[in-house]
Amino acid sequence: MFSMVTGFMNYSQQTIRAARYIGQSFVITLSHTNRLPITIQYPYEKSITSERFRGRIHFEFDKCIACEVCVRVCPIDLPVVDWRFERDIKKKQLLNYSIDFGVCIFCGNCVEYCPTNCLSMTEEYELSTSDRHEDYTIQTVMNSTQIKIDKDKPFDSRTITNY
């Protein structure tokens, strides 16, 4: 008989403990009802980026001196800098500068080490497109206007990864 009373006491203690845990959980749930929502409705509301956000890289063609520091500090050797040496002025003349944003890891090394500050990180983070061929096109900047390289040329894996 004593074991039956002890079992009933253990059962009642466990029931009271379970009710207490359920009550505590309910109080926590009710405390969250007065809070404002944290999530944003993405397509309709844009998130505010921080001051040092590393978005799409902006390039100013006129400031570049074709020193290729950006290529040397890039962990994946991504920027492609085409230039020719002008003998009459004894300087490099930039012909073409391109970065493939499908491969870029947005580390910001090129922006940080650029001696002329011709590279900068923008707050643009929507780089995806609905056309799968646009994802791997190389963005080229000439005369401060952005144009895309011929999309009719097919890209293969060697073209995209070997620079």
UniProtKB/Swiss-Prot annotation:
Key words of the record: 4Fe-4S, Chloroplast, Iron, Iron-sulfur, Membrane, Metal-binding, NAD, NADP, Plastid, Plastoquinone, Quinone, Repeat, Thylakoid, Translocase
InterPro entries assigned to the protein according to its UniProt record, in alphabetical order: 4Fe4S_Fe-S-bd, 4Fe4S_Fe_S_CS, NADH_quinone_OxRdtase_chainI, NDHI
Family annotation (PANTHER family): NAD(P)H-QUINONE OXIDOREDUCTASE SUBUNIT I, CHLOROPLASTIC (PTHR47275:SF3)
Cellular component GO terms, alphabetical: chloroplast thylakoid membrane
Name of the protein in question: NAD(P)H-quinone oxidoreductase subunit I, chloroplastic
Cofactor note: Binds 2 [4Fe-4S] clusters per subunit.
Annotated ranges, domain 4Fe-4S ferredoxin-type: 55-84, 95-124
Cofactor: [4Fe-4S] cluster
Keyword field contains Iron-sulfur: yes
Quaternary assembly: NDH is composed of at least 16 different subunits, 5 of which are encoded in the nucleus.
Family affiliation: Belongs to the complex I 23 kDa subunit family.
One Pfam family cited in the UniProt record for this chain: Fer4_7
Lipid bilayer topology: Peripheral membrane protein
Positions annotated to bind [4Fe-4S] cluster 2: 74, 104, 107, 110
Keyword Nucleotide-binding: no
Catalytic activity: a plastoquinone + NADH + (n+1) H(+)(in) = a plastoquinol + NAD(+) + n H(+)(out); a plastoquinone + NADPH + (n+1) H(+)(in) = a plastoquinol + NADP(+) + n H(+)(out)
Chief location bin: plastid
GO molecular function, one term: metal ion binding
Species: Phoenix dactylifera
Subcellular location: Plastid, Chloroplast thylakoid membrane
